[in-house]
């Protein structure tokens, strides 16, 4: 039995979304990446002097929300594994944090919340893993995924923006190891088996 889940690495500028298919009939819960999307937004430069900052933030929030909902609806996901952003000391960073929390609150499927440390540990086993280490680990574990690439010195190499997709990927890996997910997956598996047993 397989289900779809989405990993989310949220930020106002780069919102990483990764959809995976998880085999919940296997106690190890192996998963394969089926789709990924990096939704990027920037402050409006053309209208900087004519549009209020909060109006521009609303525009950007809608873009991110629509991207999240598109992936959830397109793949009919069952769970969301989310690296919850932490607060910051600057007012602007806190504003971005609040926007991301608001977008996540609109997620229509059950959400398993994860810390940045949990995600890094799931990816590399190191709490202080660098973005390059996370990207390399994600690419090595999931070569089937459509990672963002560009040409450098005549060779195709991974883009640094894969950082957000790598974090979303390892949010899934961290999430499937939580008691919360394993309990829910077990209930779903038992319900599936019971339903099919009745038909035999």
Short names for language-model regions:
Residues 1-200:
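Phosphate- and other anionic-substrate recognition elements at nucleic-acid/protein interfaces
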């Amino acid at each position: 039995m397989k289900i779809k889940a989405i990993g989310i690495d949220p930020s106002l500028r780069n919102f990483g979304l990764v959809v995976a298919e998880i085999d919940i009939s296997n106690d190890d819960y192996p998963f394969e990446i089926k789709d990924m999307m990096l939704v990027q937004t920037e402050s409006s430069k053309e209208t900087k002097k004519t549009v209020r900052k909060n109006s521009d933030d609303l525009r950007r929030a809608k873009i991110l929300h629509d991207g999240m909902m598109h992936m959830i609806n397109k793949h009919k996901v069952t769970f969301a594994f989310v690296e919850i952003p932490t607060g910051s000391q600057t007012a602007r960073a806190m504003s971005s944090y609040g926007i991301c929390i608001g977008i996540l609150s609109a997620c229509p499927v059950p959400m398993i919340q994860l810390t940045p440390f949990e995600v890094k540990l799931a990816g590399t086993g190191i709490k202080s893993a660098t973005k390059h280490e996370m990207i390399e680990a994600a690419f090595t574990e999931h070569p089937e995924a459509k990672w963002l690439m560009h040409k450098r010195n005549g060779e195709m190499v991974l883009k640094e923006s894969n950082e957000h997709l790598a974090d979303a990927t390892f949010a899934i890996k961290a999430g499937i190891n939580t008691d919360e997910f394993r309990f829910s997956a077990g209930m779903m598996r038992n319900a599936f088996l019971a339903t099919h047993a009745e038909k035999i």
